Amino acid sequence: MQGLDERTRELIQRRVLKRVKEIPSLPQFVVETLKKLDDPKSSAADVSDRLSRDEGLVIRILRLANSAYYGLPRRIVSVTEAIALLGFKTVKSIVLSASVYQFMDGAFTGYALDRGQLWKHSLSVAFVARHIAKKVKGEEEEAYVAGMLHDLGKIVLNDFVRFGYGIIVRLVEDEQMPFMDAETQVLGFNHAQVGGLMLEQWNLPETYQYAARFHHNPEECQDVPQTIRRMVDVVHVANAVCLMMGLGIGADGLQYTLSEAAMERLRMDSVEVLMSEVVDFISQVDEEFRLGD
C-alpha cells in the first residue's frame, strides 16, 4: 500500500521540525524551580516563592499532592507543606507533571484521544513506571517523569497524523502494522521520535529523551549507559500495561507489542501479576486525573 508521495512527506517533515522548534518550552521560572528542587541547599520557602508566580500551577500541584495515591495524613494547603511531607524528589515530579498538563489536556483526534485522555494515559504510565522502578530498585522519581513525558510527541504530530489518518489506519488494519510504524511509513516521522526531539529542544536529561524515543521499540536503544537502557525498558513495560488496561488507549494502541526481552532484562516474569499490583492506584488516577476543572 502506498503512503503519501515523497514530496508531501518531505514537506511534512520540514513542518514537523519547524513545529518542534516553535512549541513553547516550560516557563523559565518552572525550570529554575526544578533546579532548586535538585539543590540540597535550597529551602522549601525558596521553591514556594518561585512557584507562587503562577497561581494556577500551584493549584494543580496541590491537587496532585492531595490525591489518594500519596496517602497524606491531612490535606495540605501549600507547596511548603507538600515538600515537608513528600520530600524534594517527589515534589519535583509533581511540579513537572502539573507543568506539562497544559500541553496534554486537549483532544488529540489524530490519535482518537478525547480531551483529557492523553493526560490520563501519561499520568497512569508515570505511576506504573514508578512502581516498576521501585520493584527493580531503580530511580523511582526519574521513572515517574520519564513515564509522564513519553508521549509528548503526540501534541506536535497530532495534526499531521490526522492528515494521513486514513492511510495509517489501513496499514494497521490490512497489514497488521504497528501504528507507530505506519506513522513512520506515511509521514516520515513517528510520535516517539518527535517526543525525543522535543525533550532535547527543552534541554531535559538524555534519560527522558531516550525513554520517549524508544518507548515502543526498546530493542533499538543501543550503545547507551545501562541506567538509560533500563529506564527505556521501564517506560516501555509501563506503557504496555496501561494500554492493556485500556487507559487512554487511542488509535496507536492498535497492534502494540510488549517486548518480552524488556521484561526479562527487568527480571519480571508476568505482566498479569504487574497489572494486578497496579490496578488499585490506577483506578485512583481514573477518578482524579483532571486538574483543570
What spans do the regions from the language model cover?
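A hydrophobic, small-residue-rich beta->alpha segment in the mid-to-C-terminal subdomain
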Residues: G250, L258-R265
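C-terminal accessory extensions/subdomains outside the catalytic/core fold
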Residues: M263-G292
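Charged, low-complexity surface segments at secondary-structure and domain boundaries
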Residues: M1, L17-K18, A262-D269
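Conserved alpha-helical "signature site"
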Residues: M1-Q255, D293
